[in-house]
Structure formats: C-alpha cells, structure tokens
C-alpha cells in the first residue's frame, strides 16, 4: 500500500533471488536418495497419520484463507483503519510469523503435543475474534499477531511431522502432496470468503473462517493426535 504493487513485487523478487543465492552458496550439496516410483504412492496414502494430517491441513488452510484473502478490505471497511495502519497491521502479521518459526525451534521438540494443540487452536480463536477486535487498532494488531504466529508455527510443525513419519525416499512426495492440499485450501477458502462477502457481508469472514478452522482442530485432537502417538518415526 505504501509503495505500490510494482515496487512490492520488485522487492519480493529481489529478496527471493538473494535467498536462492544464499542457499546455493551456504548449504552443502545433498546426495540423491532412492527414486520414488508411482507404485509407492498407494502405500504412502495408506499411512493413517498422513491422511489425518492432510485432512486437518485442508480445513485449516481453508479457514485461514476464507478470512486472510479479504483482510485488507475488512480492515478498511469494518475496522475503519486507514492505509498506513493497514500496512502496519499486515507488517505485524508477517513479523509474528517469524516469531512462530522461532517458537517452533525453541519449543516443539520438548513440548510436541501442547505446541500443536495451542498453535492449531490459536488460528480459529484469532479468526473468531476478528469481528469483536475491529473496534480498536490495538486489538486488531493483537489478533493479527496471534493469527500470524500460530498459523506459521503449526505449518512448520506439520512439515516436521511429515518428514519424521515418511521414509526418506517418500518425504519429498509427501511434502508435495501437503503443499498441493494447502493450495487447495487457499482456493477453497478464497471462494468461501468471497461467498460470505457477497452474502452476509465482509464483517462475517472471521466467523466463517473460524468455524471451518474449528473443524480442523477437532479433527486434529480426535484423529491426528492419536495417529501421531501410534506412529513410529522413520526419519
């Protein structure tokens, strides 16, 4: 908003190029493992933990993007935030994601299930609070910070679980499926959010997204967590 979309894309492109150069020069070359064949896919999809994790991912991503896709007009029309404050809010949202990644590194190994439960639950809590928080910029910032932190933290934690519970020759494919389903959630959530905006109104996107994410949390607690406890790490 502050510098325009062209400059935004230019900055993102420059940062992405810098990240590629950094990875190419700093990280060591990794030997290629065994090739994954199409015949291994049915076996991968028989893993109950992966299926549960994938299902939770779809619901969480759908709920997230039912709201996030329309956060800018929500802030402008419902929270009555001006352009500079919207930029500040979205920046705080992004920075809170960095906090979520840091918390993952510090806490996940020693507090696995509490970490997953808290970060997963934080997403629908934040979404459901969007409407009530819209009366004040301070509360909007707090809700967006909670939202961004928890969303990033559970996303990274899910990827760690995928790597831990899939063979080395299958982990890349398992991760690709995860990414594909997350993108499915993005598209589905955006469509649902658009229907909410066209119907009840943009003030309701947080409630719609939160309700969907609650389903994801319930699935995680009742299906995914027991599957994780039963599974034996293979990586």
Write out the residue ranges for each language-model feature.
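Juxtamembrane intracellular "pre-TM" segments in multi-pass secondary transporters
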Residues: 26-54
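A late C-terminal transmembrane helix in Major Facilitator Superfamily
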Residues: 165-202, 208-209
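A membrane-interface helix-boundary motif in multi-pass transporters
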Residues: 1-13, 195-214
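Helix-to-loop junctions at the C-terminal end of transmembrane segments
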Residues: 99-112, 197
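Intracellular juxtamembrane helix-capping segments at the cytosolic ends
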Residues: 153-167
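Structural signature of the two symmetry-related core transmembrane helices
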Residues: 13, 114-129, 210
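C-terminal membrane-cytosol helix-exit motif in multi-pass small-molecule transporters
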Residues: 8, 13-33, 219-224
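Extracytoplasmic gate region of multi-pass secondary transporters
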Residues: 49-91, 95-98, 112
């Amino acid at each position: 908003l502050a510098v325009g979309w062209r400059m935004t894309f230019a900055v993102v492109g420059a940062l992405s190029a810098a990240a590629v150069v950094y990875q190419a020069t700093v990280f060591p070359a990794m030997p290629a493992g065994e090739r994954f064949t199409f015949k291994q896919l049915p076996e991968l999809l028989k893993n109950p933990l992966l299926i549960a994790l994938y299902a939770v991912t779809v619901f969480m991503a759908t709920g997230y993007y039912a709201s996030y896709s329309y956060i800018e007009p929500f802030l402008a029309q419902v929270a009555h935030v001006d352009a500079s404050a919207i930029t500040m809010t979205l920046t705080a949202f992004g920075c809170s994601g960095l906090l979520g990644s840091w918390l993952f590194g510090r806490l996940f190994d020693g507090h696995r299930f509490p970490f997953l439960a808290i970060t997963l639950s934080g997403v629908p809590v934040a979404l459901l609070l969007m409407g009530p928080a819209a009366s004040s910029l301070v509360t909007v910032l707090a809700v967006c910070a909670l939202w961004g932190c928890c969303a990033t933290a559970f996303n990274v934690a899910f990827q760690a679980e995928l790597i831990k519970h899939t063979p080395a020759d299958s982990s890349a494919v398992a991760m690709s499926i995860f990414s594909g389903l997350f993108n499915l959630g993005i598209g589905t959530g955006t469509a649902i959010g658009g229907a909410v905006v066209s119907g009840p109104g943009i003030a309701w996107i947080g409630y719609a997204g939160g309700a969907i994410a609650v389903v994801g949390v319930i699935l995680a607690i009742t299906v995914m967590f027991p599957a994780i406890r039963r599974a034996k790490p293979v990586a």
